[in-house]
């Protein structure tokens, strides 16, 4: 199974990169995981939030793997349990889907991009820093995979 995470933003703290790498390597051969950073649009002098999101949308759309099952992370999305995420993962795996998760920029993402998503998901009702979202998403995807393999990582 292929999972791609597109995350607007670059230059994350080292602990973010290390944590994402740690969970990504735990997937093993069953999951090909890739995190791709999308350059954020600079705000200020003549570039407002809407213009910035539009520029980021263009970069995101160019980076989405062709035919991918698109999942966007948004505060208005549904917050699945770890077991529900595992069920999604199982379905995607059975259908041979290449799943692409999108983490928007500081101002979020355009409505047009959200409408293209097959699922809108949120990790928490709390506002989280972007680096933390990368880590939490990767950990939860690993947890979902471990649930499917009856690995003791997840405990009810």
Curated annotation (Swiss-Prot):
Source organism superkingdom: Bacteria
Subcellular location: Cytoplasm
EC number: 2.1.1.177
Keywords tagged on the record: Cytoplasm, Methyltransferase, rRNA processing, S-adenosyl-L-methionine, Transferase
GO cellular component: cytoplasm
Keyword Lipid metabolism set for record: no
Any one GO molecular-function label of the UniProt entry: rRNA (pseudouridine-N3-)-methyltransferase activity
InterPro entries on file: Alpha/beta_knot_MTases, RlmH-like, tRNA_m1G_MTases_N
Swiss-Prot/TrEMBL catalytic activity: pseudouridine(1915) in 23S rRNA + S-adenosyl-L-methionine = N(3)-methylpseudouridine(1915) in 23S rRNA + S-adenosyl-L-homocysteine + H(+)
Major place of residence: cytoplasm
Binding positions (S-adenosyl-L-methionine): 73, 104, 123-128
Complexes and interactors: Homodimer.
Family statement: Belongs to the RNA methyltransferase RlmH family.
NCBIfam families, per the entry: PRK00103.1-4 (NF000986)
Summary of the function given for this chain in its UniProt record: Specifically methylates the pseudouridine at position 1915 (m3Psi1915) in 23S rRNA.
Name this protein carries in UniProt: Ribosomal RNA large subunit methyltransferase H
